Every structure is written in C-alpha cells, then in structure tokens.
Amino acid sequence: MKKGNVIIKNASQVITCSGFEGKFGKDMNNINVIENASVVVEDGIIKEIGSLEDILKKYNEKHFEIVDASNKAVLPGFVDSHTHFVFGGFRAEEFSWRLNGESYMDIMNKGGGIVNSVRGTREATEDELYESAKKRLDSMIHFGVTTVEGKSGYGLDYETELKQLRVMDRLQKDHSIDICKTFMGAHATPEEYRGRNEEYINFIIEDVLPKVAEEKLAEFCDVFCEEGVFSVEESRKILLKAKELGMKIKLHADEIVQLGGAELAAELGATSADHLLHASDEGIKAMADKKVIATLLPTTAFCLKEPFARARMMIDKGGAVALGTDFNPGSGFTNSIPLMFALATIYMDMSIEEAISAMTINGAAAIGRAETIGSIDKGKKGDLVILEYPSYKFLPYNTGVNIVETVIKDGNIVYKKSY
C-alpha cells in the first residue's frame, strides 16, 4: 500500500463541516453529518466521501490502508488556532498567586508573567526548546490536533524571537502536525526597555519585523493590545508595518479591559482577534461586519477566573467564532481539547455543532487555511479524527475525557489509542 492512502470505512457518522471559508452566524450550526459513510484519502488528499459500495467500485483496496470505523464518528482534524507552545521554564508558582487573589497584571507588574517566561526562553538553547516543544506537539496530536498555530513572544529580543521561530521551522519539517507561525515580538515590553515603549516598538518595526518578513519566518504578526502593554495606537503602528511587509495580522484584544482591540481588528482587516473577554458590543459587531474571526480561549478565562467571552452574542450578531487552547506556561498551561470543548458548550452557550465548527473550519479560517484544511471536502488535506463513540455528541457528554481513538494526518495514521 502507498503512503498517504487510506480508506476509512463504515463510519456511523462522517461530520464534514463542509466549506472552504469560515462559517459565520447561524451557519456555524451546519456541520453536515453523513450517516454510515466512508472516506477515501489518496496521496494525502481527500478524494471521496460516500458509501463503501460506491467507493470500492472506483478504488482498489489493495492500494490503501483500511481503517474500520464501525460504530465510530469521523471528524476533520482539529485546528488549535492560538498557542504559545515554544518556551523555556515554567510558572507554577504564579498559579498559586492567582489562587490567592493576585490578578494577571499584578503578577506581570512584579516581574512574573510573560517576562518570567522570557528569562527562561532566553536561557534555553535552540535544541532544548526544540525537544520540549516536540513533546508538547506529541501530546496535542493525541487530542486530535492536526494543525497548530504557534507564536514567538517569549524572546522580546532579536536573537530569541528568531530562535523561537526557527524551532517551529525545524518542527514543521520533523513533526506530523502542521504549524502556522506567528511573530509576536509585541507580547510585552522587556525589562531592558522598561519605560521606553516607543524605543522598543521602533526596534520591532525597524530591526525585527523586516528580518522575519524577509526570511518568511512567520505568516502572521500578533500584538498584545492591552492596557499597560501596547495601546491601540501602538498596536496599529506595529500591525500596519507588518501589513506593509506582506504579513497577515491578528491581535490579542480586550482580554483584561475593554480597550478597543476588537474595533482595531475590524479597522485593519485582521484575520482574527483573540481572547475578547471584555470586547464591546460595537467591537463585536464591527468584527462580524468585517469578517474578522473571533478566536476564543475558554481555558484561559477559566484559569484566570475571568468571565468567559460572549460567544453567543458574537454568533447571534453574525460573527464567526474559532476556539483555541492558548496553551502557554502561565495563564493557561493546558492543551486539553476536551476541557476547551466542555467549557465552550457548558459556560459559553455554544451548541455542540457550533463548537465543532469552531475547532475545525473556523480554526482553519483563523489562520488563513480554510481552503486546504478544517473540513472533510474533496481536494483538502487528509486530516481526520476518529472518535471511540458513534456520535459527535459524545464530545461534551464524556466531559473532559479524550475520546479520540485514531488520528490521520495527510492520509497516514499518526496516532492510535492503545487500550
């Protein structure tokens, strides 16, 4: 049999999430469930979805790996569209501080938070970062993640920012998971520039961004647009430079306070704005009107004991919601897709179908890849997840438990649960 060739036969459900762009508003509930279906992946590309009888008239079983999905549901590979998975050091002590009532900004202002991770990441060698990040990707694939977005932003200097991006470059070549790289030098102001934000912004714009764009080290530029971090005007300046250099843009917006990050994302035509815990009604509407994906990160709100983002309002206003884990060493040290799914459906008033769209086709749209991943459509990459159970509704029902049995990436089995 040829590599990249697989037939998944007799699935109780194939949830296609069909489409080549993000799903907005009511369309998020349309996940297109096909009962008793099979899927053909040839040379890593999805070729057919239909009955096994019809498929075997066109394709010779001898040339394919056969996976029996009887009494199991098949979905598109999950897309985790917001993570910070390349970092050095840990921040377990800060979790205790938060439990004792200290806020995210309290911890950041006393030298914890992002700048704490910056110290650990600067000290780590490229090989050390590579090995630790590889283990994290191994864990993610067990949850059904076949594509992940990863950010720099724990360097905040020229050498370490590029080091983080080059680690992701190496992992893209060596690991099954596809990686969308985001430059986030504007994650915080480093200690050596404290009180000199303008100088640091000029350093990013004049020295780092041009190098990242020239070497194509990242597809996206992201900025932490937040009170006490980067203002709306500072964020606009950085993001406009990134656009000028040919990069796509996204924002950490309105996470801690209502600053106007959602409105800025709409103004600049960002691909996504993320977090949005305190986004204004006007910002939510502007994002929906301008087709900016709202990437929501429920595990972070949960860990920070903050109110959840208003997913229901965003969808009802005609917006598109994606879900990401925000896996990072501080505010959300978890890559658990089951936990994220449970929080989205139980606490954010998302339907099961909306949450599935948010983890698949809208996650793909949030990183500009909805034409090639995020749904089970002919011509897309053969990235598929097989659940242990016959229905997608078991995802929240078996609350917080990983029910992924098999993961297929580019038509190859890359994970199979051992019982």
From Swiss-Prot:
Known role: Catalyzes the hydrolytic cleavage of the carbon-nitrogen bond in imidazolone-5-propanoate to yield N-formimidoyl-L-glutamate. It is the third step in the universal histidine degradation pathway.
Family statement: Belongs to the metallo-dependent hydrolases superfamily. HutI family.
Positions with a binding annotation for Zn(2+): 82, 84, 252, 326
Main location: cytoplasm
Sorted UniProt keywords: Cytoplasm, Histidine metabolism, Hydrolase, Iron, Metal-binding, Zinc
The keyword Manganese is annotated on this UniProt entry: no
Catalytic activity: 4-imidazolone-5-propanoate + H2O = N-formimidoyl-L-glutamate
Disulfide bond sites: none
InterPro entries: Amidohydro-rel, HutI, Metal-dep_hydrolase_composite, Metal_Hydrolase
Record: residues binding Fe(3+): 82, 84, 252, 326
Binding site for 4-imidazolone-5-propanoate: 91, 154, 187, 255, 331
Protein name: Imidazolonepropionase
Endpoints of the signal sequence: none
Gene Ontology terms describing biological process: L-histidine catabolic process to glutamate and formamide; L-histidine catabolic process to glutamate and formate
Pathway annotation from the record: Amino-acid degradation; L-histidine degradation into L-glutamate; N-formimidoyl-L-glutamate from L-histidine: step 3/3
Main enzyme class: hydrolase
GO molecular function (one): zinc ion binding
GO cellular component: a single term: cytoplasm
Localization: Cytoplasm
Enzyme Commission number: 3.5.2.7
Record-listed N-formimidoyl-L-glutamate binding positions: 154, 328, 330
